[in-house]
Amino acid sequence: MTTSRKSHAKDKKAGGEQDLADLKFRYDLLTNELFHLREFVSLVDYDPTHFNDSESFQKFLRETHLSLEERGEKFTDDVAKKGTNGDLTRRRRNLRTSTVVSSETTNEKKGDIELKLESIAPLVRNKCEELKYKLSDHSNRKSIVPQKRPIQHLKKREAAKSLKFKSERKENPLPLHEHIAEERYDHIAKVEEPSEAFTIKCPSDDSSFENTSEHYSDNFYFTTSSEEEDIKKKRGRKKKKPRIKLVVHPPKQTITNPLHVVKPGYESLHEYIASFKSLEDDLTLEEYNKYIDEQRRLLSRLKKGIENGALKYDKETDSLQPITSKEIKTIITYKPDPISYFYKQQDLQIHTDHLINQGIHMSKLFRSSTKARIARAKKVSQMIEQHFKHVAGAEERKAKEEERHKKSLARFAVQAVKKRWNMAEKAYRILRKDEEEQLKRIEGKQHLSKMLEKSTQLLEAQLNQVNDDGRSSTPSSDSNDVLSESDDDMDDELSTSSDEDEEVDADVGLENSPASTEATPTDESLNLIQLKEKYGHFNGSSTVYDSRNKDEKFPTLDKHESSSSESSVMTGEESSIYSSSENESQNENDRESDDKTPSVGLSALFGKGEESDGDLDLDDSEDFTVNSSSVEGEELEKDQVDNSAATFERAGDFVHTQNENRDDIKDVEEDAETKVQEEQLSVVDVPVPSLLRGNLRTYQKQGLNWLASLYNNHTNGILADEMGLGKTIQTISLLAYLACEKENWGPHLIVVPTSVLLNWEMEFKRFAPGFKVLTYYGSPQQRKEKRKGWNKPDAFHVCIVSYQLVVQDQHSFKRKRWQYMVLDEAHNIKNFRSTRWQALLNFNTQRRLLLTGTPLQNNLAELWSLLYFLMPQTVIDGKKVSGFADLDAFQQWFGRPVDKIIETGQNFGQDKETKKTVAKLHQVLRPYLLRRLKADVEKQMPAKYEHIVYCKLSKRQRFLYDDFMSRAQTKATLASGNFMSIVNCLMQLRKVCNHPNLFEVRPILTSFVLEHCVASDYKDVERTLLKLFKKNNQVNRVDLDFLNLVFTLNDKDLTSYHAEEISKLTCVKNFVEEVNKLRETNKQLQEEFGEASFLNFQDANQYFKYSNKQKLEGTVDMLNFLKMVNKLRCDRRPIFGKNLIDLLTKDRRVKYDKSSIIDNELIKPLQTRVLDNRKIIDTFAVLTPSAVSLDMRKLALGLNDDSSVGENTRLKVMQNCFEVSNPLHQLQTKLTIAFPDKSLLQYDCGKLQKLAILLQQLKDNGHRALIFTQMTKVLDVLEQFLNYHGYLYMRLDGATKIEDRQILTERFNTDSRITVFILSSRSGGLGINLTGADTVIFYDSDWNPAMDKQCQDRCHRIGQTRDVHIYRFVSEHTIESNILKKANQKRQLDNVVIQEGDFTTDYFSKLSVRDLLGSELPENASGGDKPLIADADVAAKDPRQLERLLAQAEDEDDVKAANLAMREVEIDNDDFDESTEKKAANEEEENHAELDEYEGTAHVDEYMIRFIANGYYY
């Protein structure tokens, strides 16, 4: 038994190896075929006996996952995964019985598989040799005819199955390796054939084939021999496999049209598959020869198609392509089906189209309904799901909300506690800071007292020295008086009476006390050297310059004393340096009104409310100014003069001005004259430099002397003359003095605002052309070019640059050494924290000069900025002391008294300590400042006279003015009291007063044009009726002329010769021949149709033939008619002939002699007559007709439709009229358009009538005028007026560019032929100096009176040599006269409301509607007595808001001009505006609110502060 079993096991193992070798052989064969297909695309050259073993073949197996190692690993993994499924018992049973895929092989590793492959390699090679032998034997047996032999039942089924798959391969090709395997081998699985053609069998366990090729079909798979034996053994069980049968029942066809029914060519699928045959097995010799013949015929057809051009060879696709109809370019007649053709013409559809459309529509409906149901179901399911989720998480969500609420409460409590502790910490710091400040304040007062005491002693020494110098030229008593007067002035009007002088002098230490009076004669007897020894310990403050001067020696004391004394006396003797003479004495009524009105302090002007002393925040950007009219002076002592009032000057000099009685005015003027004389004696006179072209006025020469003394004493200074006094020329004269006298040619640096950069350059070229001036501006590249070579000596003398560019290129400017640095408009350099201020401070300069047109401001930070810029360090007792370098200490010294001034306003004079501290502050700055006002030097300037010219309204103006006032809408507007509505009405009234054309333009008259006259409507109807009548007559009437029955007409046009020639042109014979041919053709067509009763239109051929027949009949009829016409025209014969009639006719026209004079006068061309009567036309052609008609020309010339003139003649005449020039064009134009007369421009306006008389007088006397107006449209009217009178003029308005203004002003100032310069008051004031004119005419007054003052200053300024006359035009009995009258009653300055040059709301807040309109105001106006602007309105508090409201009532051009003017005024803001970050103002309010919240818990706050003070908090 054991031996038999062993032998049986060996046989079984040998059989297993044989089967495995067979599988390996087939695997190699199939993989080689796939690789050959991939590489060469075709199997034509494929050799099955060649087994590839290259690297590319192995790479191909790895990429396609066909390697046996990978397949084995995948098979084992799949088996391991599928072993867990309990429903695959049948598959596991098959795997256990299998000899190849056993449970032992599943655990084999990669090395075992390679060993098995090597063991079966000889068997595989034997299989390969057998295949070679079979292939060679098969090639030898090809010539033998295959004989049919009986085959078994299984082979029949396999053959049928192979045939079936061959047919399916043609329709649905399968992978080639499967087909080759099926064709060449008989190792095919035995599967039962389906019983029906439409039944598909699907095996239940498809997963058993996953270990084999994935491309095998479901019905065929490869198995080992052991599996085949197992299948044969299991057949006896008769166990049926589960099958799925799919039975298809196609629907019955509903279309009954036999053309639409498709009949299959085969009755069953089996017959269809059996129709395919294999070339190798199933074909006989006859069938093969027949197949070869068919292929030959097909090939010959293809060649013929290529030769004929029906086919073409495509190289890209390597195939034959048919030729399209476009390429053939042949016309293919398309004859559609008659029924479809008939349907297409009527836009109908056949039955098939209806069915298809209905099916498409129904399918869309089904799809849309299905989608809608699915969407609704999804929505409902989501709602249900969300509901249950919400119900499930309610408790958890409630718990989370409670926890979140507890956390928020805890967080709020922690924040509140922390906030409270922070507040306590801030309070502790404030208390601690107050204590430290108190200590510093005590130390600062001691330091300040020492410093001011030394400054006071220095000033005493300077005054005594000046007294010595003045004694040589004047008596001692006079010098003492002058000295006392100068002392009174230098005290900044701290004294208003002799008693007050003594009191203040005792405090300040500057006046003549008994001790000082005793020392005075002793000092007078001493010389300069002895004074130096006596006051040597009083070392005055001197300026220490930048780093380059640190090694230089400091100036000696005598220089400081002389410079200080000279500058101080100069400033003391000029009454305008620290005292304002602008505030004249006011009468008792004004004083009483001022006493009644409450004073507004500086804190109210700031708009920030009152602040405590400790919390006062000084803002650098604010302008601490107090208007002279808003501050009242009160009595300082009981013995003070009653009419003296202390005012706080707006310029900010912290001074009091003394108002004297009218009787004392003369005494004051005499004192001023004596002071001017003393100034000339006290200041060292310097010669006028030769480089300067031009004459300096007296005060300008004194300014040069003062500037020269500053330079000689090595001191910086501030020239603060009022605007218009010539600070520019004084600066140029200083630089010229340095060049001529000191041989100091610079270079000097002048930093100016951008707007006046060009003005400075022009002033240098005008007054000092000897200087080399470098104007530094342009792009970065241009500025770089200008810097090239500027370090060379004498490259330039003066450099003019703007503030913006000097900061941008500060590195280049810092490297250069400058002699003098001049800052124009220096009052704008007030923010010491800005980079601009720091950059200018660090420049390498020897001297510094500040130019400002406004006095010093009250802001301590600005004062400190100027002091530090002039004196970065001071020297006291021979030591460097940064006296003003510490801003905090400076504010502590002077801040509290100035804060009291700001807070209390007018009551600051009651505080003696405050008054003395302010005086000390100005004593420090006094030696370095020079300021003069226009009022002080007005005797040296031309006088200014103002005249008011009243103008009557013209008739047209009065009519428009009264008509506007009488309107119901105007009355309602004035009665409403609305400010904007009233201003609109006032603006309209002002337009009427300026010129009526601004309110209502005088119209240009034209005639009313009618396209047709009245009779033309009836003529159209008549013409239509006549045409209808003529049409009926033409139908019934026979044309005899056409039939040659009117014989007399032939003699009118034809000659005998022409008639004979025309008769030869007859062609009747040709017509007859063509007609006969067409009739024969038509006869043939008629025979084809026969006697058909009706025409079948559904037959296209029959329809086309019928249409051709109809065309032939029409052609025959037309040719017959043409034959008759030709015959009638050629048969015309004249009786006599035109040639014979012309020969026998005599011309009766008389020829006139053209040389006769009488004939020439009678017969004149139209153009000559028009030229001769031109004067008559110009004189009397003035009446424009009210209405004209355009068709009258045709009626006058006889060119209308009803004219008896023929149509051809009318066309010729009309054409000639178009070609001929119209000599009556001028006459037609004058009668068509009536322009207003030019003289009406003047006589319609009363102001222009007065202006015409005034300009004639000014021109005769050699005067030149400036005419200003607010409205831009008035400039247009003035232009027309000046052109009408022939005046040379120039115009400047808001549209004029800034660079063009300089050219216009220079031309006007130099060209005396130009009489008038018309300007807009809104045209801007930058760069306009019109001193060439001596007359200013205000055609109308501006809303803003500051604009009028600015316009006056353009003419009345430095450089004017003649008296200036100002004429203001006012219309009588109008709004303008009422405003002027009210202004005179209130005694406003210069008849306009000007308050320190600012535009205030007093202009409207003090005027009511009744004041403006007078008796013309309606009686029912309820608010007539109320002011235009109430005190509570926003416009009353904000002038800018008022300007915006007025702009809404003005024209658009005027508003644009005003905006441009304001923009130019603020053009320099970019140079100076560098604001710092500020804290929000509402922080303090929040802190107060927080403190109020915890009111009543002081004990807790005290505990917290004590806790922090004891050091437990930190």
Swiss-Prot record:
Cellular localisation: Nucleus
Source domain of life: Eukaryota
Disordered: annotated segments: 465-524, 538-641, 1469-1490
EC number: 3.6.4.12
A Pfam family: SNF2-rel_dom
A cellular component annotation (GO) from this entry: Swr1 complex
One GO-annotated biological process of the protein: chromatin remodeling
Entry's Gene Ontology molecular function annotations: ATP binding; ATP hydrolysis activity; DNA binding; helicase activity; histone binding; molecular adaptor activity; structural molecule activity
All copies of domain Helicase ATP-binding, residue ranges: 708-873
Sequence ranges of Low complexity compositional bias: 564-586
PROSITE patterns registered for this protein in UniProt: HELICASE_ATP_BIND_1 (PS51192), HELICASE_CTER (PS51194), HSA (PS51204)
Polar residues biased stretches: 465-480, 513-524
Residues that bind ATP: D721, E722, M723, G724, L725, G726, K727, T728
Enzyme class, spelled out: hydrolase
Motif DEAH box positions after renumbering to this chain: 824-827
Compositional bias annotation for Basic and acidic residues: 547-563, 588-597, 1475-1490
InterPro entries linked to this entry: Helicase_ATP-bd, Helicase_C-like, HSA_dom, INO80/SWR1_helicase, P-loop_NTPase, SNF2-like_sf, SNF2/RAD54-like_C, SNF2_N
Function: Catalytic component of the SWR1 complex which mediates the ATP-dependent exchange of histone H2A for the H2A variant HZT1 leading to transcriptional regulation of selected genes by chromatin remodeling.
Additional detail: Present with 656 molecules/cell in log phase SD medium.
Family: Belongs to the SNF2/RAD54 helicase family. SWR1 subfamily.
Name of the molecule in the record: Helicase SWR1
Organism expressing this protein natively: Saccharomyces cerevisiae (strain ATCC 204508 / S288c) (Baker's yeast)
Lineage: Eukaryota, Fungi, Dikarya, Ascomycota, Saccharomycotina
Annotated gene: SWR1
